[in-house]
Amino acid sequence: PLEQCLSEASQAGFIGIESGGKFPKKSEELIPKLNEFNLHLCSGWYGANLRTNSVDEEKNIIQDQLKLFKNCNSPCMVFAEVSGSIQGDPNRKLSTRPQMDLEESKKYYEKISEMGKYLEDEGMPLAYHHHMGTIIETEEDTVRLLENTHESVKLTLDTGHMLFAQGNSLKFIKEFSERLIHMHCKDCLLY
């Protein structure tokens, strides 16, 4: 239950928490619930379909979450591309994840740059989440994204996903610190 999640986060000493599926979607319900446990909304997942949607379509789709996050004074939005993703599908091998050719990559970087600028103008920085089973999974994918997008496209560094993809989280902390605005610190067992 939501109350147990919030209570345990607060008891563990956290002051912020990301939104999840159990969280109210309206700020007038969410803010009092967070206040009850002395927590703030530090971000939350937005699953984008920018590969298949136009930027204008994605801007329209993101509005409810953008409004919620702004009302809750969230510092950023964790943004991940989910179109074609294999995450959560136990019948698909990791090797079948979606990948982009050079032409699609260029178009995607332009679109994600436009979304980054839009969200920055809205006061809600886009914190791109590299993720297993998606188009931006590996260290190389993530470096290309950062090197080919506008500086408004920031990074959520997820240490578990980076390790699972055989990447180096320290590299991003050292080389891309100006783009790093959110982190997911995780352990990952590799067998």
Task: Outline where the language-model segments fall.
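Short, compositionally biased strand/turn segments
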Residues: 1-4, 156-157, 162-166
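A short acidic, amphipathic alpha-helical/loop segment
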Residues: 29-33, 141, 168-175
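Active-site acidic/histidine proton-transfer and metal-coordination neighborhood
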Residues: 56-157, 164
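Aromatic-lined glycan-binding groove of carbohydrate-active enzymes
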Residues: 168-191
